[in-house]
Amino acid sequence: MSKPGGHSRHGRRDGIDPVLRSRARRRALQAVYAWQISGGFAKQVIAQFAHEQAHEVADLAYFENLVEGVLSNRAELDTALTPYLDRSVEEVDAIERAVLRLAAYELLYRQDVPYRVVINEAIETAKRFGSEHGHTYVNGVLDRAAVEWRKVESGASGA
């Protein structure tokens, strides 16, 4: 629903509700975490969480895009993250690993989402679900990665 002036009921011209996007990211984290632990198939994981998510208002299309994107691009995401980690991807705590994979997907494949939003959401998600200091690790990794992955947007000189 739009208000006069072309803004949605959320005050944004693009019609995106940031609250619903945040919920979708949290649910995507849970789905990616479950996938990492169980090794299930992407369609099964998405179907399970999409069914559960039906009771919680969230951006279902965005949730599905995140989960499918991470699961189908896992190897590329892990390769992209590796230079910014102080250990192998598999040695990173499972929650922080899921947060990093989701954020890496958004930073690399969802150029429509500002890098600051991606990093802030990842930090908040890591605070909520991760280890006591996991959010600081996530922040450090993503800050360094964003300088390279989003050079134009972050204003990095490349030097």
Curated annotation (Swiss-Prot):
What keywords are assigned to this protein?
Answer: RNA-binding, Transcription, Transcription antitermination, Transcription regulation
Q: Which HAMAP family match?
A: NusB
**Annotated GO CC locations:** cytosol
**Could you provide one GO biological process annotation from this protein's UniProt record?**
transcription antitermination
Q: What is this protein called?
A: Transcription antitermination protein NusB
Which PANTHER family does this one have?
ANTITERMINATION NUSB DOMAIN-CONTAINING PROTEIN, N UTILIZATION SUBSTANCE PROTEIN B-RELATED
* MF GO annotations: RNA binding
Origin organism is: Xanthomonas axonopodis pv. citri (strain 306)
